[in-house]
Amino acid sequence: MKTNEPLPLSSASAARRFRITALLLAALWTAVPTLVFPNFRLDIVEQFFVGQEWTFGSGSHPALTANLLDLVSRFAGIAAAPSLTAALFNLLALWSIWRLAREYLDADLALAAVFAMFGYWYLFQMEGTRYNNSVTLDAFWIFAAFLALKAIETEKNIWWLAAGAGIGLGLYFKYTEAVLALVIVLFLAADRDKRHVWRTAGPWISTATALLLFTPYIVWLLKSEFFASLAYAAGNAPRREGWQGHLLAPLEFLSNQLPLVLPPLLCLIPILWRGKGKRPDETPLPERPETGAWKRRYLNWLLFGPLLFNLAWSALGGVFLRCDLGCHIWMPLSVWALAVFGTKTTPRAAARSRAISLIFDFVCLLGVAVLVPLAPLFEKNLPRYHFPGKEVAALAESVWHEEYSRPLPWVMGEPWTRGALYDAWPWLAGNVSLYGRDRARVYSGPSHSSWGSIDQVRREGGLFLWTAGERDGEFLDALRRDFPALRVVGAYTVRPKSRFAKKDVPVGIALIPPESDEKKNSAP
């Protein structure tokens, strides 16, 4: 009996479709944000001014993510660099998911697993355009996890070397990569079929490679005594004392993960819903690749090990973890779901799942193109990506150059949290550094800026910017303790370019004269 059931995809055809689709989405998710975002969000502005320092670390993370953005911006320009760099890391992540999927699934299901991750918030989605340490971590997390799988399977030293390199480099993006190393070590210690690898050179080659690659960072950390990023990683989350915190914190973390896991799982419904059987006129998919029991256990460890780590951290410490601290956990989600539940499906179901994934991604892309320009119309406060950064930078540099002919060396500002001075990165100052011709360096206090000091800013001079009219005296009084010669220049208003902006942006500017000027003024 003839049917309209499509034939299963060959491995070559599935690989070709993956490459074409991934490259197309990378191009679109680079072009559309570049064209519609008039400015960047805080994370990206931070990456720019940290990246231009070419340091090992900042007050929140290792700086390789920022350094790579600075490198790409030199070739692609400031406007396109964040989306382009994020797209490159997303491609690495998707390639790793594809290769991981082919270890467990036939070509049709492996392609469906990758396509489902097009709906993942930290890949080709809105958050994927927000180039930051989470985006780079996600890519190297799943990349190193795949390399480790091949190392464990083949027991070849070249794969162990590659896995160690993946973890060692991943630590330069976010310390969280160490959790992956811990999960792999625990798996190898617990799994009865793979425990014997400890008697081979492989795991020790991997460990030595990771440590060797990360040693320069450790040496820098010890020499500079700049441990702020370690403190940030350990304590950057609110805590609640008592049993309520220990109970509610992990539950809140789990609930916050639902927006991350639901889109990929919904895209897989045609496969998962039909997993219990097929119609008589449907052609089943061919047998999936031979998968040993240890491989399935490795996939379980890869998904649930990091999740249990975060839940234990949250429960034991009463720590309310942010949603993005779980973004790396779900990178193998679609592969796991299909490996466990996607049995007895058909090419038609796999094709429908892929179609849903593509439609979802293109709808989200269209939403970015339409809603971002209209955002000031609906939001009470001006979104940061509509902030008139170029205009503020031009204003600040004109104030400096009225006094001095040399480039503006330093710029400081109120923290984006609106907290105390030096509490967090300065939003206004970051825009001046990013868009100004002088590319001034940003100083945000000893716990954030490893590349400067109060003495250096005092010696070379600079500007301080804040939201005029809000806590003027508080900031200026705190500043004068470090910079006695501080002089308020004035308050200005800057008009956002968006026609939907409801009000102007008030900007206060104060001048920090160079120390040489102070000496001249005090000379008899």
Indicate where each model-derived feature is located.
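Transmembrane-helix signature of polytopic, membrane-embedded enzymes
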Residues: 16-20, 97-119, 138-139
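Membrane-interface alpha helices of multi-pass inner-membrane proteins
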Residues: 53, 147, 159-174, 209-212
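Hydrophobic/aromatic-rich transmembrane helices and adjacent perimembrane loops
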Residues: 53-54, 297, 301, 317-353
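Transmembrane-helix motifs of polytopic, lipid-linked glycan transferases
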Residues: 84-105, 119, 124, 142-143, ...
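Membrane-interface transmembrane helices that cradle and orient dolichyl/undecaprenyl
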Residues: 102, 107, 144-160, 341
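Short acidic/glycine- and proline-prone juxtamembrane loop motifs at membrane-interface regions
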Residues: 126-136
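Transmembrane-lumen/periplasm boundary regions of multi-pass, lipid-linked membrane glycan transferases
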Residues: 181-295, 306, 311
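Membrane-proximal, lumen/periplasm-facing interface regions of secretory-pathway glyco-
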Residues: 319-323, 347-409, 413-419, 423-441, ...
